[in-house]
Design a protein with these regions (language model features):
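N-terminal nucleotide-binding beta1-loop-alpha1 segment
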Residues: 6-11
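Short acidic active-site motifs
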Residues: 55-59, 80
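Hydrophobic/aromatic beta-strand patches that form the interior of the parallel beta-sheet core
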Residues: 48, 71, 96-98
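Glycine- and acidic-residue-enriched helix-capping/strand-helix junction motifs
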Residues: 14-28
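Flexible, gly/pro- and Lys/Arg-enriched active-site loops
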Residues: 77, 82-110
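Short acidic/histidine-rich motifs immediately flanking catalytic phosphotransfer sites
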Residues: 63-70
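Short beta->alpha junction loops
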Residues: 44-54
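Extreme N-terminal starter segment of soluble prokaryotic enzymes
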Residues: 1-4
Length: 110
């Protein structure tokens, strides 16, 4: 089984804290953490982070026939990109959106 783990704009600059774990992880630490869990489950991963909407769409389109699923953190595009949603619907690969914060608990414009 293979998943595309796709991260959008500014995700590479965020810091993460996991309940029960001391301190924070930077983006590379978080991806190492995710990779470790996937390795334990025998899941192969292809990880990509980009700040460009078109690159996210290109990765989604290229996923068809290449991966079994997509895990997407679209960053700020979660609220604004119809094009990313269209790409996900058209590519035929099961996908899940992962957000690190709840949009309804953030700024009103989101």
């Amino acid at each position: 089984m293979k998943f595309l783990i796709l991260n959008g704009p500014n995700v590479n600059l965020q810091r993460y804290s996991e309940p029960g774990m001391p301190g924070e992880l930077d983006y590379n630490g978080m991806m190492d953490y995710v990779q470790s869990g996937c390795d334990q489950m025998g899941i192969e991963t292809d990880v990509c982070q980009t700040n460009h909407e078109g690159d996210l769409i290109d990765e989604i389109q290229a996923a068809a026939g290449r991966v079994d699923g997509i895990v997407l953190n679209p960053g700020g595009y979660a609220h604004t990109s119809v094009a990313i949603l269209d790409a996900l619907r058209l590519c035929g690969v099961p996908a899940v959106e992962v957000l690190l914060t709840a949009p309804d608990e953030r700024e009103p414009f989101r």
